[in-house]
């Protein structure tokens, strides 16, 4: 596909005006490709959806769910880069290529060493506001984990895999962890809320102390406690194996200051449920 021709057709089809510069690919998309396009009407991000993902039978339905929930977030003034609507829909299609169009937002995501208390305070607050939109006293169904580790040990041995010794030596640990996960899932409180489901630091763009959320395609109803615990860990350095407990506590305090959810829950069960 000739990309310049494609973007010219997009601009014409959506009446964005003439393309003034050749669109350039920007970083940030793991599964999809992102391009910045400058037209007579402004600067945009055009997100080209991965063909292989769109072939999945559940893809269109999942995007429809996310698009509908995205509209709810916008109605509740959650700061985010929202997909633009054309022809009464957000997802567009041209010559078999599905895509979204967003207004360009000149912010940047933060790396672990750049995250400060003010960032955790703001993200804890906005997470609470998202969860508060539509809290439901309903159980969130999370699948239990059932993995036959012995089967994989035998496969690794047959293939002379370098991971054979590792998984053989730690099989008891894997099975013990799996048991704890399944026990923890049964202890989850019966509550559901709108969740971003991918709101780690790479999906929040900052300009100074102001921010906007991006990548809203994972929006779903989920257990808010699970998302809270996961994000508090992510924003305090867990993924880099260097937790800053001041950031962790700031995130939690900000969240519970802005919600009526009970903080007195089984946090160990939540930890194992996230594994």
Name the predicted role of every residue range:
Residues 1-21:
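Juxta-kinase regulatory segment immediately upstream of eukaryotic protein kinase catalytic domains
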Residues 12-19, 74-79, 188, 259-263:
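Short secondary-structure junctions
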Residues 16-38:
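ATP-binding glycine-rich phosphate-binding loop
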Residues 31-39, 45-46, 181-226:
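Active-site acidic catalytic loop and adjacent metal/ATP-binding pocket
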Residues 39-139:
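ATP-binding pocket architecture of kinase catalytic cores
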Residues 113-168, 192:
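A cross-family kinase active-site recognition segment
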Residues 225-260, 274-275:
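Active-site activation/catalytic loop segments of kinase-like enzymes and analogous catalytic loops
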Residues 261-273:
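All-alpha amphipathic helical-bundle segments outside canonical DNA-binding/catalytic cores
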